[in-house]
Amino acid sequence: MLFLIFLSLTHVNADELFNKGKEVFLGAGNCVACHMLSDAGSNAMVGPNLNEIRPDIQRTLMAVKNGIGVMPAMEGILTDEEIEAVAHYTSIAAEQ
């Protein structure tokens, strides 16, 4: 029984993280301005098409924190929680 409760809570937390990541992608992170991602309704072509490259969480964390190419580093602009959320969101949304 406790295992089922844990699974339920984990699913809720994952959903919350996904939703928070989408908020960051569309809002504070302004990722939507440069990156194509179908789930976000973004058709931008400045940065990589996330639907095609399907970045994993670690790759996204590094790029968002440190910047890459013309993409600026967002560490210090976004909170660690926002960076984690947007990395979680993009890795899952790009797989859909």
Model-derived features: where do they sit?
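C-type cytochrome heme c attachment motif
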Residues: 26-36, 69-72, 84-88
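Electrostatic cytochrome c docking/interface patches
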Residues: 8-26, 59
